[in-house]
Amino acid sequence: MKRRTAREKALQALFQIDVSDIAPNDAIEHALDGEKTDAFFEQLVYGVIEHQVQLDEMISGHLVNWKLDRIANVDRAILRLAVYEMVYSDDIPANVSLNEAIELAKRFGDDKAAKFVNGVLSNIKTDIES
């Protein structure tokens, strides 16, 4: 499975977990839709779940005039996924994570999602790198 596909499927699983409180294993199975699983895909889903409190704190610290629970579910899932990659995936450059998140926002979010995701993640990336 290509990493871009793994990210899309991880986003679908995380969105489903966030919206419906479905068990992670069930969300993973549903997102895979009969496809063979992938280590990177599972790492993303389980990693975001395991570190969600820390990820949410980082994201919340970079929101201006927003609260995390008021952000669209899909945008919140994209932010969590990207911040997880930036912080916990040493083999992935932060710019790649940021660009992939913007592409996910363009594909799955509304017309303002990509700009919003870019702004939040750019600030987080700057903090991580300093």
Curated annotation (Swiss-Prot):
| One GO term (biological process) | transcription antitermination
GO CC annotation: cytosol
InterPro entries linked: NusB-like_sf, NusB_fam, NusB_RsmB_TIM44
Q: Which UniProt keywords apply?
A: RNA-binding, Transcription, Transcription antitermination, Transcription regulation
GO molecular function terms listed in the Swiss-Prot or TrEMBL record: RNA binding
Its job: Involved in transcription antitermination. Required for transcription of ribosomal RNA (rRNA) genes. Binds specifically to the boxA antiterminator sequence of the ribosomal RNA (rrn) operons.
* Family the entry assigns: Belongs to the NusB family.
What protein name is recorded for this chain? Transcription antitermination protein NusB
Which gene codes for it?
nusB
